[in-house]
Amino acid sequence: MSTTGPLDATLIRDVAVATATKASYDMSDTLYSYLPKVDQFYIPEWLTMQFIANNLISFTPLFSYGTTIISIEKCKTALGFSIDICATMLIASILRISYYLITPYEITLLRQSLVMIFIQLILLRTSLKYRPDEYKYQNLTDVESLSHLIHDIWFEFFSCINRPKFLSEDWKNLIKSLSFTNLLKFSFKIFLAFFYKILKFFDPNFKRIGAFWQWDDDKNFWRFLALFATVQILVTFFISNILNWDSLAQGLGSIIGSLGLLVESLLPLPQIAILYKLKSVQGFKLILLVSWLCGDTLKITYLIFGAKNISALFVIFALFQMSLDFYIGGQYIYYRYYYPKLRHQHHPNDSNSPSDEDESEMYELDLFNTLQKDVEKALKQDSNDTSDSPQDDQVGKSQAQAVTL
């Protein structure tokens, strides 16, 4: 019977440890041969900064506008948010997709357009679902007609409304007023009138021609988008890919691309008008403004340093849009922090001066009072027209009293 001494046991243990260590080294060497070693960490070859930047640009709209959708659903009202933002981004994205059919550009920007259309359709549906009565067409303000503006400007410079008689005093005064300086001022005023009409078109507080994007029937929004997208893409595809009319396709592509960039750069204008009208930031989320500014910064950086085959117009319009976003930032700071203090200084004895959170309620109350006065005026007019019928007159007075109560 053989026995194992302490020395033999120690030797056996050392041999076992050495064998296990060698086996683990062989296993690790085999594993490392399949996995590249980069600074002690495994990083896939496809996970580059370019890949991260491309996906940030493509999917940023999901976060920026997704938070707005959640906010509207939570508050059950779209007051303070302009649905014109949906129109701007949807039209611009459709134009960019049709432009891609003529002049292919970075696939990242095309992917962003598709994602933008998806999230804007959801945002439009949510905004229409909780659209307040203030945004309905019949409750908006009428804007002066262009002919009326031109008539006033003509009378201001030439002091003559109708055509003067030949060799009359008015005719002589009209000839004297036709100086170069006067004509230059008149032309400048006409330009300002056209510019004023354009700005009012982007102001959602005023009525537009044909009630564009101010329809009371929600189905009209979807009909317009379906018709616009179908006609735009089919015409572009037919000219560029079926007819192969290169000269016409290039000219059409330049128009579509420039128009799409212009429409997208005007995105902040409706929101600027809404904030100016309400004199409050109620309903407008700071996260949306931050996402706009971050998106503009990321887009400009990408266009300058990372993109290929990009026209300088992309950068110019992106800078213009960013300047409007900074203007909204100034509005937010003013109406959030300074305007309440200035209002309190003008009304120091008013201890019940409303806060920023009550601005939208005040606006709704003022609008209701205005509508109430219009109803009372209409009822009084009807009562005067039917004064020969005492019974009808009494009914009109009762209705007016009911509205007042």
From Swiss-Prot:
Give the compositionally biased regions (Polar residues): 396-405
Q: Could you tell me the membrane topology recorded for this protein?
A: Multi-pass membrane protein
Q: Please provide one cellular component term from the Gene Ontology annotations of this protein.
A: late endosome membrane
Tell me, which GO biological process terms does this entry list?
phospholipid translocation; retrograde transport, endosome to Golgi
Which residues are on the Cytoplasmic side of the membrane? 1-51, 98-103, 199-223, 276-283, 336-405
Q: Which residues form the PQ-loop domain?
A: 252-309
User: For side Lumenal, which residue ranges?
Assistant: 73-76, 125-177, 245-254, 307-312
Gene null: resulting phenotype: Mildly sensitive to duramycin (phosphatidylethanolamine-binding cytotoxin). Suppresses the growth defects caused by mutations of flippases including NEO1, DRS2, DNF1, DNF2 and DNF3, as well as of the DRS2 regulator CDC50, the DNF1 and DNF2 regulator LEM3, and NEO1 interactors MON2 and DOP1.
Annotated compartments = Golgi apparatus membrane; Late endosome membrane
Membrane among the record's keywords?
Answer: yes
Q: Which controlled-vocabulary keywords does the entry list?
A: Endosome, Golgi apparatus, Lipid transport, Membrane, Transmembrane, Transmembrane helix, Transport
Q: Which InterPro entries match?
A: PQ-loop_rpt, SLC66/Scramblase_ANY1
Q: Where is the segment annotated Disordered?
A: 379-405
Residue ranges crossing the lipid bilayer per the database entry: 52-72, 77-97, 104-124, 178-198, 224-244, 255-275, 284-306, 313-335
Please provide an example of a Pfam family that matches this protein in its UniProt record. PQ-loop
Describe its partners and assembly state. Interacts with NEO1.
Give the miscellaneous note. Present with 937 molecules/cell in log phase SD medium.
The entry's function note states:
Phospholipid scramblase that transports phosphatidylserine (PS) and phosphatidylethalonamine (PE) bidirectionally from one leaflet to the other of the phospholipid bilayer to at least partially collapse the membrane asymmetry established by NEO1 and other flippases. The PS scramblase activity has been disputed. Functions in the trafficking pathway from endosomes to the trans-Golgi network (TGN).
Q: What is this protein called?
A: Scramblase ANY1
Protein encoded by which gene? ANY1
